[in-house]
Amino acid sequence: VISPEMVTRSGLRWYKNRVVVNYDMDAKNLLKAQPSDSEDGVNKLLTMSYVTASRLLLANSFGTLDSAHVYKLSRIYPFHQFARSARPLDAFTADYPRVYGMKLTDKWSSLTFFNEDEEHSQKIAVRLSGIEGHGGAGLQADKRYYVYDFWNDRLIGIFKGSDVLEQELRKGEARQMAVREMESNPQVLSTDRHLLQGLLELSEVSWNEETKELAGYAELVAGEPMRIAIASNGWNPQSCSVSDAEVKCSSEKNSEDIVKLSLESARGGKVFWKFSFKK
């Protein structure tokens, strides 16, 4: 199991070195994750191990795990290799941290809400433009941001940088979110491949104004579709294409402004993709 005290002790070490790697040899058992009556127990254990410890010592052999457990476990691998960890954003405004943030680029942050209560739901909030460490996420007040929920695979909404983001979390839930500055052209919001939602599995993603194409590279797992959530931002999605004829490429409109691009390869590996749009 992973207790609230364990998460707190590990997370607060950020303020010693600004980077946290916890070498505690207490292995984590996915089959005993709490709460046990929903997927939130396993999701929480994996999320908070990644966010506050930067490693996971697994107690289970793969022979004891079903395909659903293995799939969830693979959402936190690989661990990122650069020297940066999530910061407890409410470290000095709460009894213990429930909000963690990590700047990935100047326009993109990772945000984690943690409900330590395994019996009751709880509202958790952060001021998006507030001071980091004092209850804020340090974003720009004059910008607008998409917030996308990883485990629940949904767009939470579009927020002003001056807004307070408040969410009601289920009992024992850890909600992992990507916060991306809103652009005028189509943009990637998230993927279903990794907890950091595009940082490790996607590269060189850019918008070509001349060809009206969003393009980039994706690192695919053999036999597993990768779904990329894209905000069309007022543009109409047209067609997708890939550099490898053996890679399947398809798309479907998920909502009025969100389209899902799906890539699948039998052998895996890196593939170049592009997705065309028109006004």
Q: What is the role of each PLM region?
A:
Residues 1-67, 93:
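Glycan-recognition surfaces
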Residues 49-52, 57, 92-139, 178-180, ...:
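Carbohydrate-binding surface patches
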Residues 158-199, 253-279:
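C-terminal beta-strand-rich structural cap/linker in extracellular carbohydrate-active enzymes
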Residues 130-153, 230-246:
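Solvent-exposed beta-hairpin/edge-strand motifs
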Residues 225-239, 267-279:
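Extended Gly/Ser/Thr-rich low-complexity repeat segments
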Residues 46-91, 174-190:
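Aromatic- and carboxylate-lined catalytic core of secreted/periplasmic carbohydrate-active enzymes
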Residues 245-253:
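Low-complexity "stalk/linker" and mucin-like segments enriched in Ser/Thr/Pro/Ala/Gly
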Residues 60, 120-124, 156-159, 167-168, ...:
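Extended hydrophobic-aromatic, low-complexity segments
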